[in-house]
C-alpha cells in the first residue's frame, strides 16, 4: 500500500502551483474545471518521486486560522536528499519571506529547514 496523492485546498491555485514548481521542480498537469461543482478547479502536481499533490480551489473557501498545534495534519515533510539543497532552499525562502525556521539538526537526527507555502501551510525540507 502507498499514498497515491495528497490534496490541498488553496484560495490561489496559480500561486500554490507556482510555489511547488519553483521550490520542488513540480510538474503541473492541466487545469481541471468541474462541470458538476461550479467554481471547483484543481491541478495535479507531480514531484520527482512519491505521491502527487492535488491542488484544489473553490471561490467560497474560508481562510483558516494558522496555529502551531491543532487537530489534523501538522505538516508535510519533503526529503530533497542533500543538506546543501536544504541550505539553498532555505536561503531562497528567507529572501522571499517564507522561512519559518532556518536549517538545523533536529534531536531525532534530521537536517531540516521549515518554510511556509503561499497559504501558510508548514513544509519541512529535509536533507
Give, region by region, the residue ranges found by the protein language model.
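Residue-level recognition of conserved beta-strand positions in structured domain cores
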Residues: 55-57, 127
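Vicinal oxygen chelate
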Residues: 3-11, 32, 43-46, 66-127
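Core segments of cupin and vicinal oxygen chelate
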Residues: 9-52
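Short, charged/polar surface micro-motifs in flexible loops or helix N-caps
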Residues: 49-52, 60-61, 83-86
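A short, acidic/glycine-rich surface segment
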Residues: 29-31, 60-65
Amino acid at each position: 500500500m502507498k499514498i497515491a496523492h495528497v490534496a490541498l485546498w488553496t484560495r490561489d491555485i496559480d500561486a500554490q502551483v507556482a510555489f511547488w514548481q519553483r521550490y520542488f521542480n513540480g510538474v503541473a498537469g492541466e487545469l481541471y474545471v468541474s462541470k458538476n461543482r461550479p467554481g471547483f478547479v484543481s491541478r495535479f502536481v507531480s514531484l520527482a518521486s512519491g505521491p502527487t499533490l492535488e491542488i484544489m480551489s473553490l471561490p467560497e473557501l474560508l481562510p483558516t486560522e494558522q496555529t502551531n498545534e491543532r487537530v489534523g495534519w501538522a505538516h508535510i515533510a519533503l526529503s530533497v536528499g542533500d543538506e546543501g539543497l536544504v541550505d539553498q532552499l532555505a536561503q531562497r525562502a528567507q529572501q522571499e519571506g517564507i522561512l519559518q525556521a532556518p536549517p538545523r539538526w533536529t534531536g531525532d537526527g534530521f537536517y531540516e529547514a521549515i518554510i511556509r507555502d503561499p497559504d501558510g501551510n508548514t513544509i519541512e525540507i529535509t536533507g
